[in-house]
Amino acid sequence: MIFASSNRHKYEEFRRMLSDLIDLKFLEVDYLEPQGEDTREIVVTSAKWLSNYIREPFFIEDSGLFIEALNGFPGPYSSYVFKKIGNEGVLKLMNGVENRRAFFISVIALSYGRGIEVFEGRVQGTIAREVRGGGWGFDPIFIPNGSNKTYGELGDEKDRFSHRGASCRKLREFLMRFGSDRLP
């Protein structure tokens, strides 16, 4: 099966979480993602477009960080915002803000012969007051509920807590039920 993305970090996470089930191949593809407020709609539209070019089963994923005090910003624009202002910029926007509640959402679209299946993962948490740990993207500033560590401090343990881990578990259940080797 193929994971199509321009983000190798995402591929590494999915490969790690699915390695016992499928042989996941990385197709590095940079495509124009439609803009909008609905992450699910963005992913489905992108998968439909990519299915014109990729002729075997594949999946893509999009995610976003939604910060309550910022009215859901950066939301579906998370990748762009990270590239422009990074973690430090988000923390600057949150300077002096007491409400640190946020959530991460991950939406996977699996495209195969019978259509498109969508799997969503969502994790509630808070925004840290400083960058903590490594990782990539907003990992060093997001603390999932039930932990006192940021994603960046969790390392591979992040897979158990993360929004991407949650959506991947749903994809995994589908592949086990349907049979990943029988996808048309």
UniProtKB/Swiss-Prot annotation:
Belongs to the HAM1 NTPase family. Homodimer. One of its GO terms (molecular function) is metal ion binding. Its EC number is 3.6.1.66. Pyrophosphatase that catalyzes the hydrolysis of nucleoside triphosphates to their monophosphate derivatives, with a high preference for the non-canonical purine nucleotides XTP (xanthosine triphosphate), dITP (deoxyinosine triphosphate) and ITP. Seems to function as a house-cleaning enzyme that removes non-canonical purine nucleotides from the nucleotide pool, thus preventing their incorporation into DNA/RNA and avoiding chromosomal lesions. The keyword Nucleotide-binding applies. It comes from Korarchaeum cryptofilum (strain OPF8). Mg(2+) binds at E33, D62. It comes from the Archaea. Keywords: Hydrolase, Magnesium, Metal-binding, Nucleotide metabolism, Nucleotide-binding. It catalyses: XTP + H2O = XMP + diphosphate + H(+); dITP + H2O = dIMP + diphosphate + H(+); ITP + H2O = IMP + diphosphate + H(+). Substrate binds at S5, S6, N7, R8, H9, K10, S63, W136, G137, F138, D139, K158, H163, R164. The keyword Zinc does not apply. It is an enzyme of class 3 (hydrolase). One of its GO terms (cellular component) is cytoplasm. InterPro entries: dITP/XTP_pyrophosphatase, ITPase-like_fam, RdgB/HAM1. Its cofactor is Mg(2+). The active site is at D62 (proton acceptor). HAMAP family: Non_canon_purine_NTPase. This is dITP/XTP pyrophosphatase. Binds 1 Mg(2+) ion per subunit. One of its GO terms (biological process) is purine nucleoside triphosphate catabolic process.
